[in-house]
Amino acid sequence: MVCEGKRSASCPCFFLLTAKFYWILTMMQRTHSQEYAHSIRVDGDIILGGLFPVHAKGERGVPCGELKKEKGIHRLEAMLYAIDQINKDPDLLSNITLGVRILDTCSRDTYALEQSLTFVQALIEKDASDVKCANGDPPIFTKPDKISGVIGAAASSVSIMVANILRLFKIPQISYASTAPELSDNTRYDFFSRVVPPDSYQAQAMVDIVTALGWNYVSTLASEGNYGESGVEAFTQISREIGGVCIAQSQKIPREPRPGEFEKIIKRLLETPNARAVIMFANEDDIRRILEAAKKLNQSGHFLWIGSDSWGSKIAPVYQQEEIAEGAVTILPKRASIDGFDRYFRSRTLANNRRNVWFAEFWEENFGCKLGSHGKRNSHIKKCTGLERIARDSSYEQEGKVQFVIDAVYSMAYALHNMHKDLCPGYIGLCPRMSTIDGKELLGYIRAVNFNGSAGTPVTFNENGDAPGRYDIFQYQITNKSTEYKVIGHWTNQLHLKVEDMQWAHREHTHPASVCSLPCKPGERKKTVKGVPCCWHCERCEGYNYQVDELSCELCPLDQRPNMNRTGCQLIPIIKLEWHSPWAVVPVFVAILGIIATTFVIVTFVRYNDTPIVRASGRELSYVLLTGIFLCYSITFLMIAAPDTIICSFRRVFLGLGMCFSYAALLTKTNRIHRIFEQGKKSVTAPKFISPASQLVITFSLISVQLLGVFVWFVVDPPHIIIDYGEQRTLDPEKARGVLKCDISDLSLICSLGYSILLMVTCTVYAIKTRGVPETFNEAKPIGFTMYTTCIIWLAFIPIFFGTAQSAEKMYIQTTTLTVSMSLSASVSLGMLYMPKVYIIIFHPEQNVQKRKRSFKAVVTAATMQSKLIQKGNDRPNGEVKSELCESLETNTSSTKTTYISYSNHSI
């Protein structure tokens, strides 16, 4: 035999030498009767091998242990049952009988490898030239059975070990229970197929179950060996690929656990208490001992077990551990109970089942009796009568893998049937081409089979020899002190889970959690722990940020704020200054009083227009000034009214116009007085532009500058309304408001009022210059007091208005400050300049008479005397200077005979 360079990395010489040595050894040591003492042989045209765990693993040094009734005898009999059915079927392998050679693996991979050498004996060239009988004759060897295919094994570790040798001899193998993902590697296990889905499908189903239950933090527990380790590896890989499930810790159960090992495992699992879910890929015995350890440590109800098909719906692992196992979710390839097998197995007796060499041992174990003196049981146990019956005198429940054993045998039979149809068309029995079956060719037919299995489900294989994944999902439940594995769903490439049918330990009404961190509240984002994506800290989206997704927060648009739970944004409420607001009531009240007072003054002046006091006040400029005062009061209503384009236009026009009217008139007055007295110091000629018409022209020229500025403002930046969200963007979004207002910035406001303030300052300067003019000649002093007070008002206005930039009440404070300042300025002018005159007109009409006409010469004399007495004013009381000035003016006036220009109609 030569090496298969393309298939194997090394020459199979070692296996051949081992097999040959084993064959020679057995030939020398065994008699014919002993050869088959531990195997079942049924003759046929085509022989199929079978590997079953008839016995459990023995103690140290002993290959086999106690009998396994269900996993061993039930499955073994299922193969014999299937062989009988096929041999009876006239349409399947007609005129061809199948035989079997069934071996016991004793649940140990090394022992199974030794036993499986029996299957390749016929393929090993025998050299017995050195072997002689006692009489010198050559020995006569029994011709070994030629095995065309093998059914088995059960455990993945056993199948892997056996598959390595069967592939060397091109013997196809179909397993009924091995689910390790490793066996899907078609480059290493190319002659291996199975009628059960691999654990990769099972792992996918378990990941889907964990995800459906909202668990993202789990631990894994595996029995040492291919099945457990491969299953956990597949689960870990799939969970890593899809994300959302993290492994808290992975524990492994040793093949030979030490005393107390299982308690240590439970304690280690408790180190991550939030990972309540435990994914188990463990053998039946390990499952039972884990549950025992959890019970011993009083952990009932803590762990949420997710068991693989090795747990399935078996009673043995949970026997006397019911409370610990309650709520366990287990998975099992979809199966059905085969009624035909039940009838077959119940009819088995010692008399009709002699082909099963282990049936007598099963009989003793099943009925608790002893068969004669050669039985294996103790002598004090009752003797078997042979009249016992299965299911009548003992409990019976069909083992879960019986269906798959039958399907595996039928898969081999259908492959042989199709092969016979192609290679031996019309031939009865085996034709020469099938006298020696080519294993590689048979493998092709196996992978191509497609039939309805014993449970009515399709049996097929993919390119790797795997069956499709179909699983039933169970939950171990306790109801009224009775226990059951209840079907709660199924998995066929996707999960179908009846969550409402699930029941948990201690009657928990909600699904128990197995998460590293609890879900964040609405409005909080996850800040994951580095290296552990399923663990996180919750951080609230602060300020104007809202939760976009579970990992991030984003800032709301300028016109929006987070909603109550910060999962989205909502429009910020829009506000404006309402008429009923305290911030509006006070300015409006002051403005109304001012308008009433101004109207009263205007009416009084109009009514007494030709009286000396009104004429002496300068009627034309007085009406201009009163108009400005009226506008200063009126602007309050425009500033409080709801903004729109028209209101904003009026605000721009009248915001500075009232002040401009007032201070333009006052400036013209003070300038006239100043020029008259300055001119009087130099000559007796009257200065220019002191007539009423000239004064009006000057006043309206000054006002036109303001109007021109407003016009330019209209052109450059047409009036419109805006919603200012930054003005009241408070730290607390709940208090944020959008302010509906005209688009008048602080800079625009300064520019609008700046010209009026310039007029006010200039007027104040003239008032200071004319402060020494005799009060009998002019209004310089009242104007001066008015301007001083007005300056104080506006100096107070500036810090209040511009110091509220960061205040939540900015709009209210600024509007109220501006309107009240303008009303106060108007009130000062009205009160100091006109209320005394109105008082005289109304209450002292006798004083409203003309005392004398003032000539410009008198003004010149007054100005000259004023200049001379300025120096004396530093050393003498003001009263004396004033008296002297007045006496001089009286004398001068009475002695003058010169013609003079009368100013009685022109206020100085």
Curated annotation (Swiss-Prot):
<dbReference type="InterPro" id="IPR017978">
    <property type="entry name" value="GPCR_3_C"/>
</dbReference>
<comment type="function">
    <text>G-protein coupled receptor for glutamate. Ligand binding causes a conformation change that triggers signaling via guanine nucleotide-binding proteins (G proteins) and modulates the activity of down-stream effectors, such as adenylate cyclase. Signaling inhibits adenylate cyclase activity.</text>
</comment>
<keyword id="KW-0472">Membrane</keyword>
<keyword id="KW-0832">Ubl conjugation</keyword>
<keyword id="KW-0325">Glycoprotein</keyword>
<feature type="topological domain" description="Extracellular">
    <location>
        <begin position="642"/>
        <end position="647"/>
    </location>
</feature>
<feature type="transmembrane region" description="Helical; Name=1">
    <location>
        <begin position="584"/>
        <end position="608"/>
    </location>
</feature>
<dbReference type="GO" id="GO:0007196">
    <property type="term" value="P:adenylate cyclase-inhibiting G protein-coupled glutamate receptor signaling pathway"/>
</dbReference>
<dbReference type="InterPro" id="IPR000162">
    <property type="entry name" value="GPCR_3_mtglu_rcpt"/>
</dbReference>
<dbReference type="GO" id="GO:0051966">
    <property type="term" value="P:regulation of synaptic transmission, glutamatergic"/>
</dbReference>
<feature type="cross-link" description="Glycyl lysine isopeptide (Lys-Gly) (interchain with G-Cter in SUMO1)">
    <location>
        <position position="882"/>
    </location>
</feature>
<dbReference type="InterPro" id="IPR011500">
    <property type="entry name" value="GPCR_3_9-Cys_dom"/>
</dbReference>
<keyword id="KW-0675">Receptor</keyword>
<feature type="topological domain" description="Extracellular">
    <location>
        <begin position="34"/>
        <end position="583"/>
    </location>
</feature>
<feature type="disulfide bond">
    <location>
        <begin position="541"/>
        <end position="553"/>
    </location>
</feature>
<dbReference type="GO" id="GO:0007601">
    <property type="term" value="P:visual perception"/>
</dbReference>
<feature type="disulfide bond">
    <location>
        <begin position="246"/>
        <end position="534"/>
    </location>
</feature>
<feature type="disulfide bond">
    <location>
        <begin position="424"/>
        <end position="431"/>
    </location>
</feature>
<feature type="binding site">
    <location>
        <position position="227"/>
    </location>
    <ligand>
        <name>L-glutamate</name>
    </ligand>
</feature>
<feature type="transmembrane region" description="Helical; Name=5">
    <location>
        <begin position="747"/>
        <end position="768"/>
    </location>
</feature>
<feature type="transmembrane region" description="Helical; Name=2">
    <location>
        <begin position="621"/>
        <end position="641"/>
    </location>
</feature>
<dbReference type="GO" id="GO:0005886">
    <property type="term" value="C:plasma membrane"/>
</dbReference>
<dbReference type="GO" id="GO:0001642">
    <property type="term" value="F:group III metabotropic glutamate receptor activity"/>
</dbReference>
<feature type="glycosylation site" description="N-linked (GlcNAc...) asparagine">
    <location>
        <position position="452"/>
    </location>
</feature>
<feature type="binding site">
    <location>
        <position position="156"/>
    </location>
    <ligand>
        <name>L-glutamate</name>
    </ligand>
</feature>
<dbReference type="InterPro" id="IPR001828">
    <property type="entry name" value="ANF_lig-bd_rcpt"/>
</dbReference>
<dbReference type="InterPro" id="IPR028082">
    <property type="entry name" value="Peripla_BP_I"/>
</dbReference>
<dbReference type="InterPro" id="IPR038550">
    <property type="entry name" value="GPCR_3_9-Cys_sf"/>
</dbReference>
<dbReference type="InterPro" id="IPR000337">
    <property type="entry name" value="GPCR_3"/>
</dbReference>
<feature type="transmembrane region" description="Helical; Name=4">
    <location>
        <begin position="696"/>
        <end position="716"/>
    </location>
</feature>
<dbReference type="InterPro" id="IPR000144">
    <property type="entry name" value="GPCR_3_mGluR8"/>
</dbReference>
<feature type="binding site">
    <location>
        <position position="309"/>
    </location>
    <ligand>
        <name>L-glutamate</name>
    </ligand>
</feature>
<feature type="disulfide bond">
    <location>
        <begin position="64"/>
        <end position="106"/>
    </location>
</feature>
<feature type="disulfide bond">
    <location>
        <begin position="556"/>
        <end position="569"/>
    </location>
</feature>
<keyword id="KW-0807">Transducer</keyword>
<feature type="transmembrane region" description="Helical; Name=3">
    <location>
        <begin position="648"/>
        <end position="668"/>
    </location>
</feature>
<dbReference type="InterPro" id="IPR050726">
    <property type="entry name" value="mGluR"/>
</dbReference>
<feature type="topological domain" description="Extracellular">
    <location>
        <begin position="804"/>
        <end position="818"/>
    </location>
</feature>
<dbReference type="Pfam" id="PF07562">
    <property type="entry name" value="NCD3G"/>
</dbReference>
<dbReference type="GO" id="GO:0007193">
    <property type="term" value="P:adenylate cyclase-inhibiting G protein-coupled receptor signaling pathway"/>
</dbReference>
<dbReference type="Pfam" id="PF01094">
    <property type="entry name" value="ANF_receptor"/>
</dbReference>
<keyword id="KW-1017">Isopeptide bond</keyword>
